């Protein structure tokens, strides 16, 4: 079977392949980021989003791969064979897991549309001959600030800003903080 884990999210393995392997942070850094930002939602029994589900699955797969690597390390007698297996897991499987973790963490952090736009921008940039492209590659975290997307049928923005509304002098009521997971 030819299964593309990014297909339902509007991306593809090919689109992510434009990013060099050293672009992706280490698995440890990605796991720490996922935990710091999304731990409550990832551990929740509630369904938050397809990205949360995919992130859970990638984290579980990596855990199982580490169990396999530990087992191989303990049970394979030949050091050369053991090194080959561990190296294969780290290089090939590690890259795929790093890509998955990066993609879903980025989609949750920046939004799917922004991440897809970044992947396309980077793909165009990397395929453009160096003499004809900007010196620096696109940067994901700056896309929301610099990208202007105009929808069809909308009138262009007015040139003069509307007058500011006077703010109420009374303090704003805060929403009660619930203990439910933040998705």
UniProtKB/Swiss-Prot annotation:
Residues with PTM Phosphoserine: 155, 162, 170
Family annotation (InterPro entries): Hepatitis_core, Viral_capsid_core_dom_sf_HBV
One GO biological process term: microtubule-dependent intracellular transport of viral material towards nucleus
Principal location: virion
GO cellular component labels: host cell; host cell cytoplasm; T=4 icosahedral viral capsid
Keyword DNA-binding in annotation: yes
Region (3 X 8 AA repeats of S-P-R-R-R-[PR]-S-Q): 155-177
UniProt entry keywords in alphabetical sequence: Capsid protein, Cytoplasmic inwards viral transport, DNA-binding, Host cytoplasm, Host-virus interaction, Microtubular inwards viral transport, Phosphoprotein, Repeat, RNA-binding, T=4 icosahedral capsid protein, Viral penetration into host nucleus, Virion, Virus entry into host cell
Motif Bipartite nuclear localization signal mapped to chain: 158-175
Domain of life: Viruses
Annotated spans, Disordered: 143-183
GO molecular function annotation: DNA binding; RNA binding; structural molecule activity
PTM comment, free text: Phosphorylated by host SRPK1, SRPK2, and maybe protein kinase C or GAPDH. Phosphorylation is critical for pregenomic RNA packaging. Protein kinase C phosphorylation is stimulated by HBx protein and may play a role in transport of the viral genome to the nucleus at the late step during the viral replication cycle.
Cellular compartments annotated: Virion; Host cytoplasm
Sequence repeats: 155-161, 162-169, 170-177
Region feature RNA binding, mapped onto this chain: 177-183
Subunit composition and interactions: Homodimerizes, then multimerizes. Interacts with cytosol exposed regions of viral L glycoprotein present in the reticulum-to-Golgi compartment. Interacts with human FLNB. Phosphorylated form interacts with host importin alpha; this interaction depends on the exposure of the NLS, which itself depends upon genome maturation and/or phosphorylation of the capsid protein. Interacts with host NUP153.
Functional description taken from the UniProt entry: Self assembles to form an icosahedral capsid. Most capsids appear to be large particles with an icosahedral symmetry of T=4 and consist of 240 copies of capsid protein, though a fraction forms smaller T=3 particles consisting of 180 capsid proteins. Entering capsids are transported along microtubules to the nucleus. Phosphorylation of the capsid is thought to induce exposure of nuclear localization signal in the C-terminal portion of the capsid protein that allows binding to the nuclear pore complex via the importin (karyopherin-) alpha and beta.
UniProt record similarity statement: Belongs to the orthohepadnavirus core antigen family.
Protein name per Swiss-Prot or TrEMBL: Capsid protein
Gene that this polypeptide is encoded by: C
